[in-house]
Structures are given as C-alpha cells and as structure tokens.
Regions:
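Extreme N-terminal leader/targeting segments of oxidoreductases
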Residues: 1-15, 33-34
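Helix-loop-beta segment of a Rossmann-like dinucleotide-binding subdomain
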Residues: 9-10, 89-98, 132-162
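Glycine-rich Rossmann-fold phosphate-binding loop(s) that bind the pyrophosphate
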Residues: 19-21, 43
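N-terminal Rossmann-fold NAD(P) dinucleotide-binding loop
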Residues: 24
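Glycine-rich FAD pyrophosphate-binding loop
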Residues: 32-52
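Short beta-strand/turn micro-motifs at beta-sheet edges
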Residues: 43-48, 86, 133-137
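Dinucleotide-binding Rossmann-like beta1-alpha1 core, especially the glycine-rich loop
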Residues: 56-134
Length: 162
C-alpha cells in the first residue's frame, strides 16, 4: 500500500471539488477566482488519469448544437489562458480537420454546418485538394472534409496543473 503524506484540510470551505483532471482543476480555479474557498481533492497527482491521456482538443467543430454556445466561450477563454495563468500550456490554434471517407459522411458534415451556421463558426467545406493543402505530404483518403481554423489544442499534462 502506498504511504501518502498526511495533509491538513481546512475546517471550512465553500466548495469541495473531487477530481484533479481538466474539469476539476478548471472548476477549482474559476471558483477560487470568484472568491470561493475551494478544496480540490485528487486521489493521485493532477492530470494523472484521463486528462493526462487526452489529446487536448478544444473544438467547436462537430459538436452537438446544444454544446456549441459553451464551446464557443471555452474557445475564447483558451485563446488568452496562457497569458492569464502565466504558464506554457502548449496552446496552438491550428484548427481541426475532419476528413470524410465517403459521400454519406461528407453529407453529414455539410448538414452539421447547415444546422449550426447561425452560431457564426467559420467552418470550411474542403474538396480532396483542399484537404491535401492543409496536410502537405499526406494524401488524404476520402471525398473531402471540413475544417474549423479557430479550433485548437493544448497539452493536457500542462493545462490541468496550471
């Protein structure tokens, strides 16, 4: 059995957050920023489980329309988070590309764009040459794709502990 160091928890707090992954850590951060006394509990080290293995995509593209308002705001936050935290999160706003393997999938992608265009996300429909232009040296199988340049990615093992 592992011997963990003994810690002294505060006698009082406003909120207890259980789990030190990206959601728990960010919840604790913003609650603290709002003036709450927060205790963050994690059974291991921060970002040592699912958040530490995730790819770190912050994407609007392909989301359920119900999720989009939240993801649009999250994307805005991520764009300035390194500066706010004074930390290197390896944030890259390089976009997200979905490649359609067949006409049916391409039609589904185009349907998503049509269903979500009122949100103002700048998703581009690409033919195979457009996909290849975004991925130099890689011949993309398929009939095209969609690309959202405002989507990005951060390094989860750096973001959660920050």
């Amino acid at each position: 059995m592992t011997n963990y160091p003994k810690i002294t928890l505060p006698k009082e707090c406003d909120v207890v957050v259980i789990g030190g992954g990206i959601h728990g850590s960010s919840s604790a951060y913003y609650l603290t920023k709002a003036g709450m006394k927060v205790v963050l509990l994690e059974k291991d080290t921060i970002a040592s489980h699912q958040s530490g293995r995730a790819w770190g995509f912050v994407r609007q593209q392909g989301r359920d329309p119900v999720e989009l308002p939240l993801m649009i705001e999250c994307n805005k936050i991520w764009q300035g988070l390194e500066k706010e935290l004074n930390a290197d999160l390896e944030w890259r706003q390089g976009g997200v590309l979905f490649v359609a393997r067949d006409d049916k999938e391409m039609s589904e992608f185009e349907g998503w764009i049509n269903d979500t265009k009122h949100f103002g996300i700048e998703t581009q429909v690409l033919d195979p040459k457009g996909v290849e232009k975004l991925t130099p040296g890689i011949t993309a199988p398929g009939v095209g794709g969609i690309y959202t340049p405002s989507d990005g990615q951060a390094e989860p093992k750096k973001a959660a502990p920050a």
